[in-house]
């Protein structure tokens, strides 16, 4: 399974032909170099010239990805906005990717989370694993959601952290040309079975509704004064159930 997972990750990086860009501080919005979140390029761009060679071992590859994830998590802590002022939104830098083509897989951190869940399940006994399988227990999501990669051409505008409307730029200039901005969005499924209310809620006592919520990610944008820079914008990242109690019964 480890080899299969690493193969998936190699394919994930291989389909992204993005050039590495210089990192800058979050406050340096005038610089077009992408801060914090890295582009997904070849293995050579991630870990030097030797990382892309065919002689790369499984151990060194795993160390490479572990190092990348640690840097992403460290950067996430550095640029996280004041949580007291933004309690209604989180920061998901892993949902943004710069690429020359549509990504074929979910964000890398999502794949790592699935892999972690597999390892946890592998440590269970057969009986415990069988009974912990959501499909066997008949578990269903409270709200049906869909996730997909979208481009700035789909979004066009977004709301930044100050509440202003900014234009999301479709392409980002790099040393060897331009790359498109892709955003991994999750929202409530309008064609799902929960469009009339949350699943499993007692309708005699509660009013329920599945609602799409948003989080902050960083993207290259242009404000109303034509100033281009990296800003935090809101994108759809989850589908949650909201409840209100029925009164007058």
Curated annotation (Swiss-Prot):
Endpoints of the signal sequence: 1-18
Known tissue expression: Expressed in the dorsal root ganglion and the spinal cord (at protein level). Detected in brain, especially in brain cortex, hippocampus, midbrain and cerebellum.
Disrupted gene: phenotype observed: Mutant mice are smaller than wild-type littermates, and most die during the second week after birth. They exhibit impaired motor coordination and balance, head bobbing and tilting, and spinning during perionds of hyperactivity. Mutant mice display a strongly reduced number of neurons in the dorsal root ganglion, trigeminal ganglion, mesencephalic trigeminal nucleus, vestibular ganglion and nodose ganglion. Cell death of vestibular ganglion neurons is strongly increased 14 days after birth. The number of facial motor neurons and sympathetic superior cervical ganglion neurons are not decreased.
Glycosylation sites: 123
Alphabetical UniProt keywords: Cleavage on pair of basic residues, Disulfide bond, Glycoprotein, Growth factor, Secreted, Signal
Disulfide links within the chain: 143-210, 188-239, 198-241
Post-translational modification: Mature BDNF is produced by proteolytic removal of the propeptide, catalyzed by a FURIN family member. In addition, the precursor form is proteolytically cleaved within the propeptide, but this is not an obligatory intermediate for the production of mature BDNF. Can be converted into mature BDNF by plasmin (PLG).
SUPFAM superfamilies (alphabetical): Cystine-knot cytokines
Result, substituting residue 68 to M: Reduced hippocampal volume, dendritic complexity and context-dependent memory. Decreased density of dendritic mushroom spines and synapses. Impaired fear extinction. Increased anxiety-related behaviors
Site residues, Cleavage: 59-60
Name used for this protein in its record: Neurotrophic factor BDNF precursor form
